[in-house]
């Protein structure tokens, strides 16, 4: 793992975008994208730039079960608002959280991943070490699947909803094995709340108790963190 220390999330977004541009110059065509507050500074850099993404494909990590693209809390809505409406891509894929058969939709999404191999995967990390919505206990070879969200994840995401009861309890997520198929990983984390997870990911054993620790077995991982997130290393 390559660890890059930055002063703040704004600098982290700039650094991540530099790595994406470098990858695109070297032929990258597919970006794996994430949602939440962590990648927002990256998407600001992307939308403010003159870089053309119309030949790029994106594959998103996850989506809440029960929310469609018109729902403001859905991850499809988030991606459209923060990136795709401002910077068109050739194709954009987000899991279908409203599918009648979620298992079939998950298997179909895995086929999409295999048909569009991810060149650069953007990741955040949960306070419990989750990547995507792969909670502790998820098999490290897991593929796209339906996830029961933990109480800590629901509480971490309640700030996006009017009340905690409105937070979906399930999601469709790329599995850890799905994520590991990507050629290059860029994981960003900011703030003291992420320090324990960063320590476990980098210094701890590879274990299902810390899903992000699987990245120790990947050949090309860049970790972009501020001093607070790095404080327990």
Curated annotation (Swiss-Prot):
InterPro entries the UniProt entry points to: Glc/Gal-6P_isomerase, Glucosamine6P_isomerase, Glucosamine6P_isomerase_CS, NagB/RpiA_transferase-like
Function (record text): Catalyzes the reversible isomerization-deamination of glucosamine 6-phosphate (GlcN6P) to form fructose 6-phosphate (Fru6P) and ammonium ion.
Coiled coil stretches, renumbered: none
Entry EC no(s): 3.5.99.6
Pathway the protein contributes to: Amino-sugar metabolism; N-acetylneuraminate degradation; D-fructose 6-phosphate from N-acetylneuraminate: step 5/5
Family of the protein in this entry: Belongs to the glucosamine/galactosamine-6-phosphate isomerase family. NagB subfamily.
GO cellular component, one term: cytoplasm
Keyword Plastid attached: no
Active site: 62, 128, 130, 135
PANTHER family in UniProt: GLUCOSAMINE-6-PHOSPHATE ISOMERASE
Native organism: Enterococcus faecalis (strain ATCC 700802 / V583)
GO process terms (BP): carbohydrate metabolic process; glucosamine catabolic process; N-acetylglucosamine catabolic process; N-acetylneuraminate catabolic process
Catalysed reactions, as listed in the record: alpha-D-glucosamine 6-phosphate + H2O = beta-D-fructose 6-phosphate + NH4(+)
Keyword Flavoprotein listed: no
GO molecular function: glucosamine-6-phosphate deaminase activity; identical protein binding
Keywords assigned: Carbohydrate metabolism, Hydrolase
HAMAP family, A to Z: GlcN6P_deamin
Protein name: Glucosamine-6-phosphate deaminase
């Amino acid at each position: 793992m390559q660890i890059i220390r930055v002063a703040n999330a704004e600098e982290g977004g700039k650094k991540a975008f530099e790595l994406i541009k470098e990858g695109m110059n070297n032929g990258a065509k597919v970006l794996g994208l994430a949602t939440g507050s962590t990648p927002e500074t990256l998407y600001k850099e992307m939308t403010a730039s003159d870089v053309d993404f119309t030949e790029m494909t994106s594959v998103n990590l996850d989506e809440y079960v029960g929310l469609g693209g018109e729902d403001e809390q859905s991850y499809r809505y988030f991606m459209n608002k923060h990136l795709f409406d401002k910077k068109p891509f050739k194709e954009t894929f987000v899991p279908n959280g409203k599918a009648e058969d979620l298992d079939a939709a998950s298997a179909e999404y895995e086929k999409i991943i295999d048909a569009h191999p991810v060149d650069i995967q953007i990741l955040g990390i949960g306070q419990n070490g989750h990547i995507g919505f792969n909670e502790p206990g998820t098999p490290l070879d897991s593929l796209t699947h339906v996830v029961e969200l933990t109480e800590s994840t629901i509480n971490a995401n309640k700030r996006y909803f009017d009340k905690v009861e409105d937070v979906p309890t399930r999601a469709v997520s790329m599995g850890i094995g799905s994520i590991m198929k990507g050629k290059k990983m860029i994981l960003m984390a900011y703030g003291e709340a992420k320090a324990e997870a960063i320590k476990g990911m980098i210094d701890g054993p590879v274990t299902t108790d810390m899903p992000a620790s699987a990245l120790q077995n990947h050949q090309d991982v860049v970790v972009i963190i501020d001093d607070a997130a790095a404080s327990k290393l």
